[in-house]
Amino acid sequence: MGSSCSRSHSLSEAETTKNAKSADIDRRILQETKAEQHIHKLLLLGAGESGKSTIFKQIKLLFQTGFDEAELRSYTSVIHANVYQTIKILYEGAKELSQVESDSSKYVISPDNQEIGEKLSDIDGRLDYPLLNKELVLDVKRLWQDPAIQETYLRGSILQLPDCAQYFMENLDRLAEAGYVPTKEDVLYARVRTNGVVQIQFSPVGENKRGGEVYRLYDVGGQRNERRKWIHLFEGVNAVIFCAAISEYDQMLFEDETKNRMMETKELFDWVLKQRCFEKTSFILFLNKFDIFEKKIQKVPLSVCEWFKDYQPIAPGKQEVEHAYEFVKKKFEELYFQSSKPDRVDRVFKIYRTTALDQKLVKKTFKLIDESMRRSREGT
């Protein structure tokens, strides 16, 4: 009898403990669900090389704790790889241009520098490439300063030359210093393709503000082979931030050198706009890389892009830059309304001029986005 009571008491205690654990789990799930309801999901989309990942890194720097020393150091090999990649593209580009251009002589590299070019190109093709040192930097500098390479650099838009090329070439000595730790600016310029999905949680008004809106930003690879990973992220999105590199109207895709990058961006934006799951989703368009655009538009006519063939320039200088920008902006606005069904045109749609490397501008832009989305939720 006593034994039976003892067993019954033990079972009762076990059941109580089990119920308490279950209630604790339920309570935590409820808390997490409530917390999730206050997190606004942002999806960062765009074609490859649009500057999405630079925007993502800026958010980490601006609204989180930034990069610690270990994270900064992890970019050393990436940055050195960018240098090798740049010099190889220029070297191979010069060789090709010297064969096909009518004024081919200006692309002929001196014999001594050809030897250096072969050596550095071989390094870029290796998985175990050495980190930059003083000796290698002297070689890179010597080849970079060759007149043929400088002429080739001016043709960078046809060579898949990364935007970071000039920045890293101007900082070679620092990059090769013993104990080199990349700066925040180095990290922003560093080019590494996004594979898979990365996310970050932040508040544009500061993590400590009471009642501040919290956002979760997702960045996914922009190259064609990465886009199949986008679909599973589409549900429950509060806003799509679409990055369009407006400076790339004369460039071809990295993965398909027969396809103009701006035409690819147009088609991709059109496709995203038509997705059923975005019927009520806000759209934010970043017309990015304006810093490169304002320099290029003075030299390369906007009409080289099929989409912009009806563009009529007005005058050289700043006035022309603004005129060209407004033309591109209008094209995207027209595309938005053409691609949106009548019942979707009242969803929030904002366009921002951006330069992903400009920290102040990115900060200001995200504060404006935060304000716009808050007003939309409040119906004001």
Curated annotation (Swiss-Prot):
The region called G1 motif is annotated at 41-54
Matching PROSITE patterns: G_ALPHA (PS51882)
Q: Which CDD domains does the protein's record reference?
A: G-alpha
Checking SUPFAM superfamilies in the record gives: P-loop containing nucleoside triphosphate hydrolases, Transducin (alpha subunit), insertion domain
| Induction record | By infection with an avirulent race of rice blast fungus (M.grisea) and sphingolipid elicitors. Down-regulated by a virulent race of rice blast fungus (M.grisea). Down-regulated by 24-epi-brassinolide.
GO MF annotation: an example: G protein-coupled receptor binding
Co-factor(s): Mg(2+)
State the residue spans of region: G4 motif: 284-291
Q: Which residue ranges are recorded for the region named G5 motif?
A: 354-359
Supply the alphabetized keyword list.
Cell membrane, GTP-binding, Hydrolase, Lipoprotein, Magnesium, Membrane, Metal-binding, Myristate, Nucleotide-binding, Palmitate, Plant defense, Transducer
Q: As annotated in Swiss-Prot or TrEMBL, what is the tissue specificity of this protein? A: Highly expressed in young internodes. Expressed in the base of the stamen, pistil, lemma, and palea before flowering and in the pericarp of the ovary after fertilization.
Q: Where is this region: Disordered?
A: 1-25
Gene3D superfamilies according to UniProt: GI Alpha 1, domain 2-like, P-loop containing nucleotide triphosphate hydrolases
One Gene Ontology term from the biological process aspect of the record:
brassinosteroid mediated signaling pathway
Q: Which residues bind Mg(2+)?
A: S53, T194
| One Pfam family per UniProt | G-alpha
Keyword Lipoprotein (UniProt): yes
Q: Which residues are modified by lipidation (S-palmitoyl cysteine)?
A: C5
* UniProt-annotated location(s): Cell membrane
Protein name per UniProt:
Guanine nucleotide-binding protein alpha-1 subunit
Where does this protein come from, organism-wise?
Answer: Oryza sativa subsp. japonica (Rice)
